[in-house]
Amino acid sequence: MIKILNANEVEPDWFTGRNFTDANEVVQEVIKDVIENGDAALKKYGAKFDVSAPASFLIAESDLKAAAEKLKKDHPETYDAVCYSHELAFKFASRQKDSFDDFEMEIAPGMFTGQKTIPVERAGVYVPAGRFPLVSTVVMTVTPAAAAGVDEIVMCTPPRVHPDDKAKAEAAGLGVPGKPFAGGKPYADEGIMAAAYICGCKKVYACGGSQAIAGMAYGTESIPQVDVIVGPGNKFVAACKKAVYGKVGIDMVAGPTEVFIIADSSADPAWVAADLLAQAEHDVVAQPVMVTTDRGFAERVSAEIEKQLETLSTAQTARQSIDACGKIIIVDSLEQAAEFANRKAPEHLELAMEE
């Protein structure tokens, strides 16, 4: 059950609690291995952590195209939604780019200064595909890079068994967690492949985890070195992005996903509970948090969470997140709620209130 706390019971460390101590040592070894052994290291970690350890990494463009065509045929509404999302994101990113004014000025006689905004040559995108492949991440990372005019967009995403290899893998009882199918063709989640094709990314590598981040940061025989790496991931991906910062640029150290909802009694407890669970189902260490001044409302949301967990298909993951990392915090005022939000600086901030 989600914890209900008074404001004075919240530990100060919680506000800055993106702690990757247990992951740092692991990723340092991964980075060292990738630098020294390149593709061989990527294959070693793929065989250890993924359901597939392909013989090579670059997914054929024909497979990307086929995935997009399959999505259009089998799930036309989803296909249209991805296309529309790409269109909207491209418009917004293009407007952002236009807002960066280039200029030159003579600040003193004979002394000229200025500003010129240019895209990086090669951007690396990481798209998770663990419990839930994140098609939306493709749109939110690839599309801005395309709008910015990046010459080459490289994507890494965890491997899957290629359709051509599925019968062989199934016959051998392979291609499942703990029993990877090795040596097949590179492939990935079909939704991610389809979205990559729709958004214009044609270089997709079947490589996941911290080893993919290290591969993009330092380059291997197969994966080119990039200038900047963007995209979310688990704590090992986040720790690796933090470790390679300086060698390459990064967007941010995101860590486990989180939502922070400021709500009052005018909100529907069922809706608030659903939003908390929508984040909780991502990861067992996701942080679903609600802040309110009304303890009665907090208890109604807590009860609604328990009710919805009974029928949630992702309840196993969501339950662990809610019990271990979930919080409902009772504050004295909305001003204190805003203060907590500013201190936490969450990935997702939601206001569910009348005013």
Map each language-model feature to its residues.
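N-terminal Rossmann-like NAD(P)+-binding subdomain of aldehyde/semialdehyde dehydrogenases
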Residues: 1-121
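Conserved small-residue-rich beta-alpha loop and adjacent elements
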Residues: 105-192
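Conserved NAD(P)+-binding/catalytic subdomain of aldehyde/semialdehyde dehydrogenases
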Residues: 174, 197-287
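Conserved C-terminal structural/oligomerization subdomain of aldehyde/semialdehyde dehydrogenase
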Residues: 322-355
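Short acidic-hydrophobic, aromatic-tinged amphipathic segments that line or gate anion-handling sites
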Residues: 3-7, 203-208, 328-333
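Glycine-rich phosphate/diphosphate-binding loop of Rossmann-like nucleotide-binding domains
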Residues: 136, 146-165, 183-187, 263-271, ...
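Flexible, acidic loop-helix segments that line cofactor/substrate-binding pockets
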Residues: 60-76, 253-259, 282-298, 303-330
